[in-house]
Amino acid sequence: MLLIANIIVFFVTFLPDFAHSYWPLTLFGAYPSPSIGNVIGKFGLVPALILNGDQIYTFFTSMFLHADLIHLGGNMLFLYVFGDNVEDTFGHVRYLLFYLVSGIGASSLHIYAALSLGGSAIPTIGASGAIAGVLGAYFVLFPRSKILTLVFLFWITIVAIPAVVFLGLWFVYQFLYGSIGAGGGVAYWAHVGGFVTGIVFGVAWRGRRRKRGL
């Protein structure tokens, strides 16, 4: 459901661009899209505005927006791979609430980092913070599951890596790049905040199941 919702919002956002001949370029981010610029300005999360109590709704709207097809595709791949098991564990309604809370947790840490490091006027969009919460929950609930991963050594091969290793390395990467102030359009601290939120939910859920003897 969340995957479909993100895809629908993406194409609705870019709908005005389809009237122009350059629309394939805007979908892949190779040409600036007037429509996405307007949408980001209104529904993207801007830390400075949130701090002033403005546009609080962007905590939710920003996590369903994507800048281009590559941005959307990368996020939806992670949501597709890791989301189904977590959703089956939590149940549909709880999973939706968990996803939204993870997005808020991700945005909250991003806001704090943006205010501390600068960039508080730059809007943020994307589902990656909320999806990082899904990764955090998966890290706790399915640590021994194997993740098929493309590895580039002297040749390209596929290796089955335990989730605890794959996601652990992913988190360390996000934390380190966030700590050195790396940018490049990636909200590293949002990923950290979402992942930690997911871990908290995962640990709480596992403790709840143990109390019930499940």
Regions found by a protein language model. Name each.
Residues 1-214:
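A detector for small-residue-rich transmembrane helices and their helix-helix packing motifs
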